[in-house]
Design a protein with these regions (language model features):
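A conserved segment at the C-terminal end of the G1
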Residues: 1-12
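NTP-dependent small-molecule kinase module
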Residues: 4, 83-84, 124, 128, ...
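Conserved beta-strand scaffold positions in the cores of enzyme catalytic domains, especially
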Residues: 11-16, 108-110, 161-163
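Conserved nucleotide-sensing/catalytic segment adjacent to the nucleotide-binding pocket
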Residues: 12-18, 24-72, 87
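Amphipathic alpha-helical transducer elements in NTP-driven molecular machines
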Residues: 44-47, 51, 116, 134, ...
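Conserved Switch II/interswitch segment of TRAFAC-class P-loop GTPases
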Residues: 60-68, 113-118, 135
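Short gly/ser/thr-rich secondary-structure transition/capping motifs
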Residues: 67-76, 88-93, 143-147
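ATP-dependent NMP and nucleoside kinases share a basic, alpha-helical "lid"
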Residues: 76-130, 185
Length: 187
């Protein structure tokens, strides 16, 4: 959905900041113990750095965005240089969890996806991109991901200015969001 929105906007006007880039570094944790870290809990994120860098972008300053490896569960030495743009999209299922981050947002969007769609997306992503087995992904979903969704993600719906039902399949809502952002750019 984010790609569809970004592709409809002038390239020079938008930057996407993936929340996943701001996972805390786990390199100090022994490799065999990293599998027990709950990456679906808000404590897994470096909120201070994310808020600091979004603030910098809003002030017209460039940032050095961290990179994160899902394979090793560690922050990488490489960074991504990001120039400030008129539109900053913070992409992530926990983007509305932090009050400090919410305060930096002009428009807060919650994408409401069906539980089955969330599970299917998780399986596809973790098996294809992260080299995990379907069994491992399903087990993690049942033990951790589902509970974390209901405890931390679902409650943030109340902070959203716009709630998009049907996840990324809601073409009318996506078009409406594209028009809203386009209107903002013309102001």
């Amino acid at each position: 959905m984010v790609k569809e929105i970004v592709n409809s906007l002038p390239e020079a006007s938008v930057v996407v900041i993936p929340q996943d880039s701001y996972y805390k570094d786990s390199s100090h944790v022994p490799v065999e113990e990293r599998q027990f870290i709950n990456f679906d809990h808000p404590d897994a994120f470096d909120w201070d750095l994310l808020v600091e860098q979004i603030t910098m972008l809003r002030e017209g300053k460039a940032i050095e965005q961290p990179t994160y490896s899902y394979i090793t569960c560690t922050r990488q030495p490489e960074v991504v240089h990001i120039e400030p743009k008129e539109i900053i999209i913070i992409e992530g299922i926990m983007a509305l969890v932090s009050p400090q981050l919410r305060d930096l947002m002009d428009l807060k969007v919650y994408v409401d996806a069906d539980a089955d769609d969330r599970l299917i997306r998780l399986i596809r992503r973790d098996v294809i991109e992260r080299g995990r087995t379907p069994e491992t992904v399903i087990s993690r979903y049942e033990r951790i991901v589902k509970e974390m969704h209901w405890e931390f993600i679902e409650p943030t719906k109340k902070f959203a200015d716009i709630i998009i039902p049907q996840g990324g399949h809601n073409t009318k809502a996506i078009k409406t969001l594209q028009m809203s952002i386009g209107y903002f750019l013309k102001r």
